[in-house]
């Protein structure tokens, strides 16, 4: 019997979770990683590991800002939002989340043993609860508060 790569098995299980939960994002991400792993493209993994998060945040930011850039949300509407208590609360929460994310990056860099749990938790949250895969950095930031590390 040939040796089965456990990493491939993990990617397949996570892709299956994506299919079962009808979460195309998880499914496509896992299948893309699977293709990269089993083809000569696997030599790009260091690049993906180094820049993937930055590229993902860039794409997410473009998607979030597109309505402003296209004019669908006007400058006046943006300015008016600062007069609303919900928008002001959103600003405060945005600052808090950014701070948590920075703590998360630090924790993930200094304690790589936490990364696997954070990633599995995030993928499960995305696959099973229709979450959005922006959680690892924030989750790591919250974890850093709970375990007292930065």
Curated annotation (Swiss-Prot):
Annotated compartments: Cell membrane
Annotated membrane topology: Multi-pass membrane protein
InterPro entries assigned: UPF0756_TM
Keyword line: Cell membrane, Membrane, Transmembrane, Transmembrane helix
Chain segments annotated as transmembrane: 8-28, 51-71, 88-108, 123-143
Signal peptide positions (record): none
Keyword Transmembrane: yes
One of the Pfam families matching this protein, by short name: DUF441
This protein's name: UPF0756 membrane protein plu2726
Membrane among keywords: yes
Main location: membrane
GO cellular component: plasma membrane
Species name: Photorhabdus laumondii subsp. laumondii (strain DSM 15139 / CIP 105565 / TT01)
Family according to the record: Belongs to the UPF0756 family.
């Amino acid at each position: 019997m040939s040796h089965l790569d456990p990493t491939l098995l993990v990617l397949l299980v996570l892709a299956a979770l994506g299919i079962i939960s009808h979460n195309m994002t998880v499914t496509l991400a896992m299948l893309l990683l699977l293709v990269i792993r089993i083809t000569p493209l696997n030599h790009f993994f260091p690049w993906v590991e180094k820049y993937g998060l930055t590229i993902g945040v860039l794409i997410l930011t473009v998607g979030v800002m597109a309505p402003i850039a296209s004019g669908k949300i006007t400058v006046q509407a943006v300015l008016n939002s600062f007069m609303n208590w919900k928008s002001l609360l959103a600003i405060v929460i945005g600052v808090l989340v950014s701070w948590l994310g920075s703590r998360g990056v630090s924790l993930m860099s200094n304690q790589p043993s936490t990364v696997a749990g954070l990633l599995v938790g995030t993928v499960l949250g995305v696959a099973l609860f229709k979450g959005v895969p922006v959680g690892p950095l924030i989750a790591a930031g919250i974890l850093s508060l709970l375990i007292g590390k930065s």
